[in-house]
Amino acid sequence: MTKPHFAVSCQHYSFAVNAFVDVIREFDAYQYDFTIREEQTHEIIEDVTNLKSELGVIYLSSKNTEVLSKMLKRNELEFTELFTATPHVFICDSHPLASKKSITMDDLQDYPYLTYEQGEYNSQYFSEEFVSTLDSRKNIRVRDRATLFNLIIGLNGYTVCSGVISAELNGRNIISKPLDVEEYMRIGIISRKGVVLSRYAREYIEALKAHCM
């Protein structure tokens, strides 16, 4: 009997991991060979282009839509929006700004900005974070989510994301606060044009919607 296969590549979103867990629990197969990759943005696009992953999870904004849309079109990929989010700041619950209802960029100037390294594609177009490092005096780049959240706690640092947070994966001492900017993030999936999605991919998309709506 052939093992069912499914692979997804995503930016460092806890809801993407939770949706992956839901798919495995939903099918509860005797055997399977599934893969989830938290990667740099260009790697996600390459994985889906080369059918290494059936789906990718990324975001588009006014700052990166033009560049990434051209890249997706060139690689015969399509972007399907799942939801729109306003940018939020992730900080620890003991942070000096933790009591504020919303946070401004000026509020953050004295604190380290944690971002995910994008390798040779380290530009704002491929950044996972909505705010450019050029807007911050103190910048630290990391490769994995655990390190990022440890530094947020240890250094009173912050990162900028969609605001969808998982206490189980990120820890209960990480909190989310709205960032006071007039912008938004369109989070969605990328897939190959003309490729019929597997039942696992379809279920994964539904699980993503459930975690993000």
Task: Place the predicted regions along the sequence by residue.
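Beta->alpha turn/N-cap motifs
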Residues: 40-41, 57-64, 92-93, 144, ...
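Hydrophobic hinge/microswitch elements
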Residues: 49-54, 119-175
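A bilobed periplasmic-binding-protein/Venus flytrap-type ligand-binding module shared by bacterial periplasmic
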Residues: 90-98, 186-197
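Beta-alpha-beta core module
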Residues: 74-80, 85-86, 147-194
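Secondary-structure junction motif
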Residues: 16-22, 65, 105, 109-133, ...
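Short, well-ordered beta-strand segments
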Residues: 5-11, 56, 90, 114, ...
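Central regulatory/effector-binding core of bacterial HTH transcription factors
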Residues: 3-67, 142
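Flexible hinge/capping segments at coil-to-helix
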Residues: 71-87, 91-113
